[in-house]
C-alpha cells in the first residue's frame, strides 16, 4: 500500500487511519520550543462525515486510502438517497443521504460531481469547490442597515443551502459560492 509522510500531506488527500478512510482538511506543522515537531491534522471520515483532529510525529508515514473518484451526473433526489449516473456507461447508482451528509445542500439536478468509491462502494460526493447558484429567497436590503454594522444577510439558494450574502445582493441573482466554507464569493454576471 502506498504511503505518504505527514509533512507532505495536503488538503484533499485521502488516507487510511486505523483501517478507516479519511480525507485531509488541513495539516498544520507545529515546532514546540522543547520536544519533537509534530503535525496537527484535521480530517473528515469518508463514511460518516465526522471531522476529527489528530496529531502525528513529523515525518510519520500514513497509508493512502484505496479510493477512486469518478465524475457522475446527479439525476434526482429521493427521500432516502440521491441517484447518480455514470455518463460513459449510463450505469445508475444510489448513494444514501446519510453517506452524503451536509454535502446534500450543494447538490443540483443535472450537475456533474465527484463520486468517491471506497472498496468498490460509493461512499461520498464532492461538489466542485465553487458553484454558481440562484438566490431563491432573501430579504431586501434596508436603507441604514450598514450604519448598524450589518453588512450581511441570510439567503436561501436554489439547492436549499443557506448562506450569508452582502446586503446589495437581491433575490433572483446568480452568485458564486465556496462549497468548502459555505461563503459568498461574488456575483455572477449573466
From Swiss-Prot:
Keywords from the named record: Cytoplasm, Elongation factor, Protein biosynthesis
Cited Pfam families: EFP (PF01132), EFP_N (PF08207), Elong-fact-P_C (PF09285)
GO MF, one example: translation elongation factor activity
Family assignment from sequence similarity: Belongs to the elongation factor P family.
Gene3D superfamilies: 2.30.30.30, Nucleic acid-binding proteins
GO biological process: peptide biosynthetic process
Gene assigned in the entry: efp2
One GO term describing the cellular component: cytoplasm
Record-given protein name: Elongation factor P 2
Biological or metabolic pathway of the protein: Protein biosynthesis; polypeptide chain elongation
Transmembrane portions of the chain: none
Main location: cytoplasm
Cell compartments where the protein resides: Cytoplasm
Alphabetical list of CDD domains matching this protein: S1_EF-P_repeat_1, S1_EF-P_repeat_2
PROSITE patterns: EFP
Amino acid at each position: 500500500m502506498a504511503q505518504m509522510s505527514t509533512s507532505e500531506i495536503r488538503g484533499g488527500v485521502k488516507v487510511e487511519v486505523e483501517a478507516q478512510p479519511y480525507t485531509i482538511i488541513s495539516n498544520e506543522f507545529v515546532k514546540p520550543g522543547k520536544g519533537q515537531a509534530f503535525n496537527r491534522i484535521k480530517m473528515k471520515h469518508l463514511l460518516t462525515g465526522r471531522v476529527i483532529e489528530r496529531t502525528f510525529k513529523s515525518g510519520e508515514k500514513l497509508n493512502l486510502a484505496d479510493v477512486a473518484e469518478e465524475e457522475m451526473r446527479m439525476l434526482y433526489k429521493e427521500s432516502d438517497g440521491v441517484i447518480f449516473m455514470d455518463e460513459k456507461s449510463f450505469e445508475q447508482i444510489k448513494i444514501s443521504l446519510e453517506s452524503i451528509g451536509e454535502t446534500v445542500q450543494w447538490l443540483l439536478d443535472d450537475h456533474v460531481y465527484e463520486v468517491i468509491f471506497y472498496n468498490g462502494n460509493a461512499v461520498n460526493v464532492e461538489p466542485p469547490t465553487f458553484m454558481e447558484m440562484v438566490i431563491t429567497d432573501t430579504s431586501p436590503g434596508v436603507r441604514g442597515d450598514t450604519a448598524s454594522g450589518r453588512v450581511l444577510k441570510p439567503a436561501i439558494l436554489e439547492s436549499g443551502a443557506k448562506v450569508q450574502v452582502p446586503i446589495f445582493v437581491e433575490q433572483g441573482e446568480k452568485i458564486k459560492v465556496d462549497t468548502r466554507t459555505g461563503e459568498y464569493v461574488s456575483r455572477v454576471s449573466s
